[in-house]
Amino acid sequence: GGSVPCIETCVWTGCFLVPGCSCKSDKKCYLN
């Protein structure tokens, strides 16, 4: 634990820094 794999925020584009993350409605990226 302790790590946050999806650290990006997103508006119109997807999430690129960590594979397997997607943009959610709160404009943050989460693991699928």
Swiss-Prot record:
Disulfide bond positions: 6-21, 10-23, 15-29
Top-level taxonomic group: Eukaryota
Entry keyword set: Disulfide bond, Knottin, Plant defense
Pfam families named in the record: Cyclotide
GO biological process entries: defense response
Cyclopeptide (Gly-Asn) crosslink, residue number(s): 1-32
Role according to the record: Probably participates in a plant defense mechanism.
Protein family (similarity comment): Belongs to the cyclotide family. Bracelet subfamily.
The protein's name: Cyclotide glopa B
